[in-house]
């Protein structure tokens, strides 16, 4: 009996893999992953030297990134493609985590500034009650200095003058927060 055309597939040597073990990836998904890695590479290239030092990169990838930072226009685009290709051959999860940590630190700083601004506004509006809250947060805060700054800020607000003392209150609160952390 002659073999049917589909029977020759059964005789391929080394074909021990079951069909359910194979994971098929579409061409579109591969392209999306490639583009995402290129964007990741571009984000890394846009970082400054200090931030770049905090990201775990091997020597080849770091050299490619430093070269891309010096190149302009079309050469930069090609270099970013090369960086994307290099990232495809590496485990990018530690790089992503370090990048997220850098971005998150900035977001945390913005949130802290908003909290300090709200606390400053409460200090000006409520006075001694808010001072007690500040002293609970930072026991080493100077009560007398805060009272003086609050009194000056209220006078400036009533006289429609620039909020010099309000800025000083914010700076003082920021110093307290930085000394704590």
From Swiss-Prot:
Chief location category: cytoplasm
Subcellular location(s) of the protein: Cytoplasm
Ranges in coiled-coil conformation: none
A single GO BP: assembly of large subunit precursor of preribosome
Gene Ontology cellular component list: cytosol
Keyword annotations of the record: Cytoplasm, Ribosome biogenesis, RNA-binding, rRNA-binding
GO function terms (MF aspect): ribosome binding; rRNA binding
One Pfam family linked to the record: DarP
InterPro entries in alphabetical order: DarP, DarP_sf
The protein's role, per its UniProt record: Member of a network of 50S ribosomal subunit biogenesis factors which assembles along the 30S-50S interface, preventing incorrect 23S rRNA structures from forming. Promotes peptidyl transferase center (PTC) maturation.
NCBIfam families for the chain: PRK05255.1-1
Family: Belongs to the DarP family.
Classification via HAMAP family: DarP (MF_00765)
Name this protein carries in UniProt: Dual-action ribosomal maturation protein DarP
Species the sequence originates in: Shigella dysenteriae serotype 1 (strain Sd197)
């Amino acid at each position: 009996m002659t073999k049917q055309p589909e029977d020759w597939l059964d005789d391929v040597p080394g074909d021990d893999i079951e069909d359910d073990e194979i994971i098929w990836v579409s061409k579109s998904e591969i392209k999306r992953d490639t583009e995402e890695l290129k964007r990741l590479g571009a984000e890394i290239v846009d970082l400054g030297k200090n931030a770049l030092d905090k990201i775990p990169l091997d020597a080849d990838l770091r050299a490619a990134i430093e070269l891309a930072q010096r190149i302009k226009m079309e050469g930069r685009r090609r270099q970013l493609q090369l960086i994307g290709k290099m990232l495809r051959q590496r485990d990018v999860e530690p790089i992503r985590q370090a990048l997220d940590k850098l971005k998150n630190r900035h977001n945390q700083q913005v949130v802290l500034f908003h909290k300090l601004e709200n606390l400053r506004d409460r200090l000006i509006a409520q006075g001694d009650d808010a001072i007690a809250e500040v002293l609970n947060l930072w026991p080493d805060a100077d009560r007398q200095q805060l009272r003086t700054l609050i009194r000056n800020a209220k006078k400036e607000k009533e006289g429609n003058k620039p909020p010099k003392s309000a800025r000083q209150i914010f700076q003082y609160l920021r110093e307290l927060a930085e000394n704590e952390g």
